[in-house]
Structures are given as structure tokens and as C-alpha cells.
Amino acid sequence: MNVFVLNTGRCGSTTFIKACQHISNYTSSHESLLDRTGDQRLAYPKNHIEADNRLSWFLGQLDNKYADDAIYVHLKREREAVAASFSKRIDFGILKAYEQGILMHQEHRYPASDIALDYIDTVNANIALFLKDKTNKIDVSIETVNTDFIGFWELIGAEGNLDEALDEWTINYNAS
């Protein structure tokens, strides 16, 4: 069964996949198909764990392809911390795309933190709505990751080295 780690970004998805690389009965990647379109965008191998914040823009297609035949993780981090991290990246990446492409601001009309909070709330609401009728799901919070990741490990029937996986959470990957 496939596992999809849905998230806003800036919430530990890189570390999540580093931890999952200690699982022997699943493959795992971070943003592995981000440049693909059409059927190839969601063409993940079986028994694969994928973390990609852009999946929040493909929830309809994800539901059409996998429906309830996947495990879904809603990876979260305290919203003010996510906003602070995103605010440093207002001029590139997903936050720039959101501000200029979705909100249609050609220049910065609001503080970066306001744009970031709006993006975070929008993406989390979309993910929550998508997960409303899913049976194979779990919330994982960075603030309680030592407990939550063990629950995730058990939910997917992971095999491998849990202690090494948990140790990954002590390393700050992709920080800003």
C-alpha cells in the first residue's frame, strides 16, 4: 500500500523521509515526481512513501487514483513556526507561487507572515477536507513526533530500525 505525507511544507517533510529510509519494507522519497504531469505525476511504485507539499494541489487526482487504497499522513507543525520559516522564502517557491499566482498580487501588498498564514490555513483546510472520509490516516505533529512517528510506524506495519528512524528527528534538515 502506498503512503502519502500531505503537508504545507516547512514542517519536517524532508526529515520525515530521512526517518522513513530506515524502513525496509517500503521505498521512500521526497518530492520525487514534482516535475511530472498527467498520469506520470502520481505514478509512484507500490509500497512507497512519498512526501511532497505539492500533492495538496493534486488531491482530486490523488483521490481518483488511490481513493481509500492508501495511507495518508497529515504532517503538521505549529503554524506560527511554519509561517516564520515560509516568510524567509516569500520571493521564491510555493509561497511566491501562492502570492502571485493564486492571490494575484504582483507586488507585496501584505506582510510575508500574513501571506504565509493564509497559505498554511488554506492548505491544511484542503488536506483536512480530503481526509474527512479516509479510513487509513494519521496526523503527525513535529511537536509530538517521537510518539506520533511510532504510531505511524505501527499503522503502516513498518519493518526496519525504529531507533535509527527516531534519531533522524534530532537532525535539523532543510532549515531556514
What function would you assign to each model-found segment?
Residues 1-52, 175-176:
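PAPS-dependent sulfotransferase catalytic core
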Residues 1-2, 44, 112-113, 133-135:
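A short, structure-level motif marking secondary-structure boundaries and short turns
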Residues 9-11, 22, 34-35, 54-56, ...:
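Short, solvent-exposed loop/turn segments at secondary-structure junctions
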Residues 39-46, 65-67, 132-133:
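Flexible, charged surface loops at secondary-structure boundaries
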Residues 48-50, 138-141:
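Short catalytic-loop micro-motif centered on adjacent basic/acidic residues
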Residues 52-55, 120:
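A conditional alpha-helix N-cap/helix-loop micro-motif detector
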Residues 59-129, 136-139, 147-160:
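PAPS-dependent sulfotransferase catalytic domain
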Residues 157-176:
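C-terminal accessory extensions appended to soluble enzyme cores
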